[in-house]
């Protein structure tokens, strides 16, 4: 997670963590997604818990990016985001 935070902060590609993030997920990778969404104009509490607000923000990002808006951060959404 530290590597991911460093690379995201410095505009470098962050590799997909290998697991989809969805409602109920938690941890540093969720926090990283929340921080990225906030940098794109969302106003999430970056607490590392993937709840309804994070899912809605992910769906908005997916729609803007031409992806299926399912609220899940899978590999395709991750690659567009990072």
Feature names for model-found ranges:
Residues 65:
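Conserved micro-motifs of the catalytic ATP-binding
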Residues 2-48:
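Acidic, Ser/Thr/Pro/Gly-enriched interdomain connector segments
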Residues 37, 58-61:
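Conserved hydrophobic/aromatic packing and binding residues within compact polymer-binding modules
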Residues 62, 73:
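DNA major-groove recognition helix of helix-turn-helix
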Residues 75-81:
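PDZ domains, with a preference for the canonical peptide-binding region formed by the helix
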